[in-house]
């Protein structure tokens, strides 16, 4: 992908913000080297890594990555046999500590069943060198200073050195306490010159202490003298310092030699930790943006839900739905230069670069974005400044370059296509450029203020119009993208709001050609209907949410009912069994007494009568009643398939299987509600046997109410479905083999609803969108059985 587009879409600013979430220079370096990938599998893996990082952040808040340092230069010096200083060795030790902590951290997550396979595999590559880490920890502190615990010899040298220094200070302090000190010394302090302890003596008393003069003050009035009495002690101290230095060098050389045996392992650990830092930075950035992991498409499909430009204030930016690649591959955003059109282009372009770089995007869940081989953008006139060309020449030079490189895996963003020249010629060029881009198979989003391009979205099957909503009350754009609605000029409305005379406005309107005026009136009407539809849609969503909540409550109550019923039945069984058992016991006693009487010679009592009596008592004991959720009657096993009609046993409702979630669960459409239902709670409903086909003699009369097409444009969803249902009956009675249902392109909501209804109609054999001559995807052709 070309670097130029990253600059145009300000991807560098995204990387700068992302770098703030890195914990190390290694993470920052990986971020600044980040570039959008074009291979679908690579992008998919990068997105999964970020999602796993986000899962870790959600579960643990952070990861033990702090303390990671770039030690690659240190390792290179070890490779050529050099020794490291204390700070460099400490930094390697710190990386080894982070490696161990990170591996333990990841193992803990994996042990509790957290699904992070990619990052789990990454942590498996970390090698724990605990002995090496501990050797460094007991030898060097975080400032790089060698600790006394580094060796017994160093500890002994330093103990002797401290005692020697104490003796020197003690001797010099005795001079400071002398009663003549105030007279002979410039100041009662011990200081150091040339790394030897000295005292400040006035010039005139320099011979009193003997010894060596190491320095003097600027005025020459004070001499810094090492008295003769401490010269030997200072010499001893210097010798000990030399031994200390020698031992430190030996320790550093020894540790460096030890580390040289683990260069490859330390190098790999550091690289892996850098990857972890990079991935976790992406996850933290996504959390800060309130971003989501998008679904990826390798067929050019884009469906962004409530997408936001990541560089704009999240509290103020207007979220927009942007969809492309299914019903149309070209969007032409028309309307006046009131702002918002270019932001839409940049939002789509920048979110595409982010997604292909493995970043989450600021949009709602279930958003889909395509993976392109190249993203091209002609936005702004930065070239004209560089090359001293006119705005038009600048844009045209860029467009020529784009058309030479573009293919079916490309996204092109044209801003103000055809601008900077004669409007009529500019509009014609814009149309030709859009057609050329489509022939190359590219996905295109273009903005323009030329009204001539409004027709482009209507007379090209691959294209649709769009606009940015403008509020004439506030005289400002709302920045709401309206796909399917072309832009219109608001000049007359704005002028009226600003106080221009009505007579002038009326005269101006008369000068506008009828076709343009009708088009603007049509667009205005479409906008009003769209706003109404959006309000009704939101109301319907609210009702659906309420119905869903009610259904859940009902399901809960039904479950409670059956549980309570089972409990009561069980209690009744136990009570009844107790009563009968008691009766049996009493009967046994009676029978025993009767048999005793029989043995004693009592007449009239037969043995078989005793047995019959006991059998009848045994049968009186009630059987256990097992009844919970109704179970499906035994029948030939049926393998459920999408589209099957079923009965939901726990609800007693009929529904249709939509798709299989797992072997144990299905998505079921019950009326207007879609629910997850367990397979064991489903009973298959056999389809009705087809009735014997009747031969229908079609008699067409001039006053027959049924026509060969039904126009639903402008209808509400519920009204439209009722009309379709009634119309199909009339068309069947009239004997039509096929009919056309016109629903328009629009947002696709009505088209989708009608299509779903037709798929489930018992008399519909097949459905398809119309050919270009029949109205394209604004018309559905229905063939009857």
UniProtKB/Swiss-Prot annotation:
In alphabetical order, the GO MF annotations are: ATP binding; ATP hydrolysis activity; ATP-dependent DNA damage sensor activity; endonuclease activity; mismatched DNA binding; ribosomal large subunit binding; rRNA binding
Q: Which range is the signal sequence, renumbered to this chain?
A: none
Please indicate if the UniProt record lists Ribosomal protein as a keyword: no
UniProt superkingdom: Bacteria
Alphabetically, which GO biological process terms does the record hold? Answer: mismatch repair; negative regulation of DNA recombination; rescue of stalled ribosome
Q: Which UniProt keywords apply?
A: ATP-binding, DNA-binding, Endonuclease, Hydrolase, Nuclease, Nucleotide-binding, RNA-binding, rRNA-binding
SUPFAM superfamilies in the record? DNA repair protein MutS, domain III, P-loop containing nucleoside triphosphate hydrolases, SMR domain-like
What EC number(s) is this enzyme filed under? 3.1.-.-, 3.6.4.-
Q: Which PANTHER family match?
A: OS10G0509000 PROTEIN, OS10G0509000 PROTEIN-RELATED
**Quaternary structure (record):** Homodimer. Binds to stalled ribosomes, contacting rRNA.
Q: What does this protein do?
A: Endonuclease that is involved in the suppression of homologous recombination and thus may have a key role in the control of bacterial genetic diversity. Acts as a ribosome collision sensor, splitting the ribosome into its 2 subunits. Detects stalled/collided 70S ribosomes which it binds and splits by an ATP-hydrolysis driven conformational change. Acts upstream of the ribosome quality control system (RQC), a ribosome-associated complex that mediates the extraction of incompletely synthesized nascent chains from stalled ribosomes and their subsequent degradation. Probably generates substrates for RQC.
Its name, as the record gives it, is Endonuclease MutS2
Q: Which organism is it from?
A: Listeria innocua serovar 6a (strain ATCC BAA-680 / CLIP 11262)
């Amino acid at each position: 992908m070309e670097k130029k587009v990253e600059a145009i879409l300000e991807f560098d600013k995204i990387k700068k913000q992302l770098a703030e979430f890195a914990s190390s220079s290694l993470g920052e370096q990986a971020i600044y080297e980040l570039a959008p990938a074009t291979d679908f599998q690579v992008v998919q893996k990068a997105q999964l890594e970020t999602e796993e990082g986000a899962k870790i952040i959600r579960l643990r808040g952070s990861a033990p990555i702090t303390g990671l340092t770039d030690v690659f230069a240190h390792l290179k010096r070890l490779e050529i046999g050099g020794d490291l200083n204390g700070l460099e060795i400490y930094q390697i030790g710190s990386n080894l500590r982070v490696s161990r902590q990170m591996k333990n951290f990841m193992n803990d997550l994996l042990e509790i069943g957290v699904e992070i396979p990619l990052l789990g595999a990454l942590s498996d590559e970390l090698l724990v060198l605990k002995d090496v880490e501990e050797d460094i920890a007991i030898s060097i502190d975080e400032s790089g200073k060698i600790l006394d615990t580094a060796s017994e010899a160093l500890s002994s040298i330093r103990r002797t050195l401290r005692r020697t220094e104490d003796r020197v200070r003690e001797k010099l302090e005795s001079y400071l306490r002398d009663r003549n000190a105030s007279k002979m010394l410039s100041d009662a302090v011990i200081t150091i010159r040339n790394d030897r302890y000295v005292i400040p003596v006035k010039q005139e008393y320099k011979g009193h202490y003997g010894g060596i003069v190491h320095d003097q003050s600027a005025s020459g009035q004070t001499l810094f003298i090492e008295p003769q009495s401490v010269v030997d002690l200072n010499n001893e101290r210097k010798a000990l310092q030399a031994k200390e230095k020698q031992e430190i060098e030996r320790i550093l050389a020894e540790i460096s030699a030890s580390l040289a045996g683990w260069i490859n392992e330390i190098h790999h650990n550091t690289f892996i930790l850098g990857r972890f830092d990079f991935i976790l930075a992406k996850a933290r950035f996504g959390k800060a943006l309130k971003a989501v992991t998008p679904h990826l498409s390798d067929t050019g499909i884009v469906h962004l839900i409530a997408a936001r430009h990541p560089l704009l204030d999240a509290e103020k930016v207007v979220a927009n739905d942007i969809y492309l690649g299914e019903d149309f591959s070209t969007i032409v955003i028309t309307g006046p230069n009131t702002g918002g059109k270019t932001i839409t282009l940049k939002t789509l372009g920048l979110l595409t670069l982010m997604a292909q770089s493995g970043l989450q995007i600021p949009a709602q869940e279930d958003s889909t974005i395509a993976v392109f081989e190249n993203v091209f953008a002609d936005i702004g006139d930065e070239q004209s400044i560089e090359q001293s060309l006119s705005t038009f020449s600048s844009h045209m030079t860029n467009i020529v370059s784009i058309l030479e490189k573009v293919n079916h895996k490309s996204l092109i963003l044209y801003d103000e296509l055809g601008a900077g020249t004669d409007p009529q010629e500019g509009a014609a060029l814009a149309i030709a450029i859009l057609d050329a881009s489509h022939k190359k198979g590219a996905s295109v989003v273009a903005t323009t203020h030329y009204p001539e391009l409004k027709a482009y979205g209507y007379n090209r099957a691959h294209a649709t119009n769009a606009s940015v909503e403008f509020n004439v009350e506030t005289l400002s754009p709302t920045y709401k993208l309206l796909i399917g609605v072309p832009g219109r000029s608001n000049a007359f409305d704005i002028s009226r709001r600003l106080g221009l005379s009505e007579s002038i406005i009326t005269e101006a309107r008369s000068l506008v050609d009828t076709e343009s005026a009708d088009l603007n009136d049509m667009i205005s009407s479409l906008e009003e209907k769209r706003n109404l539809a959006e309000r009704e849609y939101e109301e319907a969503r609210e009702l659906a949410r309420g119905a869903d909540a009610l259904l859940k409550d009902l399901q809960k109550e039904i479950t409670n009912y059956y549980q309570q019923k089972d409990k009561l039945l069980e209690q009744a069984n136990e009570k009844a069994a107790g009563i009968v058992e008691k009766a049996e016991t009493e009967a046994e006693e009676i029978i025993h007494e009767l048999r005793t009487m029989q043995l004693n010679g009592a007449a009239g009592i037969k043995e078989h009568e005793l047995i019959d009596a006991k059998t009848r008592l045994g049968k009186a004991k009630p059987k256990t009643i097992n009844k919970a959720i109704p179970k499906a009657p035994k029948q030939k096993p049926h393998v459920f398939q999408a589209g099957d009609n079923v009965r939901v046993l726990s609800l007693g409702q009929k529904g249709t299987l939509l798709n299989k979630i797992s072997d144990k669960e299905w998505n079921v459409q019950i009326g207007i509600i879609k629910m997850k239902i367990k397979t064991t709670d489903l009973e298959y409903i056999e389809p009705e046997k087809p009735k014997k086909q009747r031969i229908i003699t079609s008699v067409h009369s001039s006053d027959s109410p049924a026509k060969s097409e039904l126009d639903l444009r402008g209808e509400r969803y519920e009204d439209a479905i009722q009309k379709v249902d009634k119309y199909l009956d009339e068309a069947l009675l009239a004997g039509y083999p096929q009919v056309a249902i016109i629903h328009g392109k629009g947002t696709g909501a009505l088209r989708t609803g009608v299509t779903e209804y037709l798929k489930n109609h018992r008399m519909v054999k097949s459905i398809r969108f119309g050919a270009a001559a029949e109205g394209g995807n604004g018309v559905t052709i229905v063939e009857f059985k």
